[in-house]
Amino acid sequence: CGVPAIQPVLSGLARIVNGEDAVPGSWPWQVSLQDSTGFHFCGGSLISEDWVVTAAHCGVTTSDVVVAGEFDQGLETEDTQVLKIGKVFKNPKFSILTVRNDITLLKLATPAQFSETVSAVCLPSADEDFPAGMLCATTGWGKTKYNALKTPDKLQQATLPIVSNTDCRKYWGSRVTDVMICAGASGVSSCMGDSGGPLVCQKNGAWTLAGIVSWGSSTCSTSTPAVYARVTALMPWVQETLAAN
């Protein structure tokens, strides 16, 4: 897991406001969650052939689909996999009011076929550390300006630093809890439509899922950290759910 066949190229600190187009296929775990009309509403990450992790607040149902192997949503010619969702496992501790425990696991009805452009991200162990200042990456088809009418066609990426929860609370106060991890305030920001997608950090050469795009500034301010679900804190529930299903 976590080693793309097509290497990503990050130009350092490039939403994904102020992001840049990704190299096609270089974030092979990134999926698009689309409703029955083909509208992209959230991102997600493949963690195996059968499972996708996304944000609980995305409100995914079994009538939505997971699209894997996509880069340009404006192209009909891409070799994408449109995968039906068999079952939705929303974290029972998720609260829409506090946005805590913002994680949902999707069991695919038919497994994804792994290829050069479709593969899994690594999950962290529950005790893994992603220290403040560590440079990580986030990807998505979210808005590139908060007031944009539509989302970009091409997958966007940005490099951004982890922000400690203590520093993050300087912006957000007590809303930031230990089931969250912050990143950004560095000239880039996740934005609407990126939700559910990955915040990944490279550990020993493999990209590992540190966060799930959860919430942040309503104007996608690039000087304010965005808040992600902290995957390490949610790993006990993830392991339990995968083991039981």
UniProtKB/Swiss-Prot annotation:
Gene3D superfamilies: Trypsin-like serine proteases (2.40.10.10)
Alphabetized CDD domains for the sequence: Tryp_SPc
InterPro entries, sorted: Peptidase_S1_PA, Peptidase_S1_PA_chymotrypsin, Peptidase_S1A, Trypsin_dom, TRYPSIN_HIS, TRYPSIN_SER
Coiled-coil region: none
Reaction equation(s) it catalyzes: Preferential cleavage: Tyr-|-Xaa, Trp-|-Xaa, Phe-|-Xaa, Leu-|-Xaa
Keywords: Digestion, Disulfide bond, Hydrolase, Protease, Secreted, Serine protease, Zymogen
UniProt domain Peptidase S1: residue ranges: 16-243
Name listed for the protein in its UniProt record: Chymotrypsinogen B
